Every structure is written in structure tokens, then in C-alpha cells.
């Protein structure tokens, strides 16, 4: 059974799923509907076209940067990005990142999952135009969702965010819902 998390809540992944070796991190969001204007009134509202990009940043001892896995660098350190979704349209995960926990270097202590809006300044876009944002973790071996964090705060004015992190503590993997 999946655990629904709140901002700042942590869970021990190693205790939730015994023998957990590989996770899929799904990130999703929807563009808010545009409102106002006579054309929107006549023809109905439309969604903004927002290109959000998910990334995973691997950190070593002492929070030292190791690598950034994103649409331009799809795999490194046994972390795999499944590709860029340019619109966020449709149901389900918009971008996915797989982490092979069993084969990560022992030097990696944490993986930070971030999302930014591509060309945000040029397009005058921020997370105030995003709704239904979430991050979820799935056990790759069973396909079962372990946990999910729905980001519900108002993030207007922000163009990049840390959604969550997976980190190693005393040999166990844990998840922290940051948002």
C-alpha cells in the first residue's frame, strides 16, 4: 500500500520494501488553465504550454556534487532518465528517472530530484502556472507504488524546485519529501 506523504515527511524505504534494489521515480504536473479574455470565453479556456524538466543530482560524501542526470545526460552513476516531456500533457508521470540502488557507488549518499521550467524567463513562466505536481516512488521489481508526495503549496514566482531526495543513512535508503 502506497504511503501519501506531506511536505517534510520522511520514510525509510528499506523498511517499507525489504530488499528494495531499484526504484522508478515518477514526476508529474499539469499546466493550469488560462482564463479571461473574450476568446477564452467564446472558445473555452486552454492550458499554458509549459516545458518542465526533471533532473536527478547525485551527491557524494559531504554533499559533494557528482553528476546531474537530465534530458541532456540521460544516464550516469546507475541513474537513468527516461527522456524529456516537452508539454506535460496527458495523465500519469510526465518524466521518469530510474535509480539502481543495488549498484550505486558506495560514495553516493543522496540523490536530489529537481524540476525547473525550461526558458522560464523568456516565456515569463513560473510554478504558479503549474497544478497537480507530484513525485512518486515505485518498486521496479513489482511495479507497486511505495510512496507519493503531492506538492500543494503555492509556488508562484519559483522557476526551479527541489521536489524530494533519496538518501543513504546507516546503510538504509530513505525518502524526504521537500517541495
Predicted segments with their positions:
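Intrinsic-disorder/low-complexity signal
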Residues: 1-179
